[in-house]
């Protein structure tokens, strides 16, 4: 896939402004920045990554395995100029919702929230998102992952979600498509889901948004995602190997793994049940520096 060149009034690349201003379907917060997100993976969704991304107006979705006390400490030690670019991540377990509510009690903050599950089509996911929205009306809520327009509409209209995370299996450390045969071509998924999200208008003309998650191995892939209409693009592998990632440097390389990989299961003491398949892999990526 290539983009056809178009006529432009831009005389130089330095005239290009890649910042965006967004209003949201449910949350009445406004957001200004560069709509590129660091993925909420163990290795990339770190406090260090969040600080660096915030400095340049990018987003970091923290991974969900931080201890509550560490999250409260991080959030209360930083001001809004940083926190508007940080997303609190969680799954859909009851214990994670309890943790989120305790975070609010301890910090007094309603954070931007990323509700992340492997299968956004599971029964109860929309209900869970709606429950979070009921208690966190001010938060910008992003949820996924899905890959089809009907679920995008369902999450926005009935789940109280502002941004739908789109992508089933395109990540460089994900093997879902190979193991299960489930997925949808990523560029097509973004294109079709964007039409569904942008077609939904609230009473004051705010519409749903889409974040393309996965499939970006080169800068050109990010460009194509935006060309397909994505409002945000999420990166994992492209940011892996930097100083801000969680991992040791061994022979000039750093470890990067998918969140459904055996490495992730072992790290977080997830039981290897007979019904649970490994849908991610562990790779070594070159160390890239800061």
Where do the PLM segments sit?
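Short glycine-centered, acidic/aromatic-flanked micro-motifs in structured strand/loop junctions
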Residues: 40, 90, 117
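N-terminal capping/small domains of soluble enzymes
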Residues: 1-87, 257-259, 271-290
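Alpha/beta catalytic cores of nucleotide-metabolism and tRNA/nucleoside-modifying enzymes
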Residues: 2-11, 159, 181-290
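Active-site-adjacent beta->alpha loops and helix N-cap segments on the catalytic face
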Residues: 12-14, 65-79, 93-102, 117-141, ...
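Catalytic cores of alpha/beta
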Residues: 49-50, 97-104, 141, 147-166, ...
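Short beta-strand/loop segments at the ligand-binding rim of alpha/beta enzyme cores
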Residues: 29-38, 80-89, 109-112, 132-147, ...
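Alpha-helix termination/capping residues and helix-transition junctions
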Residues: 55, 105-109, 135, 157-160, ...
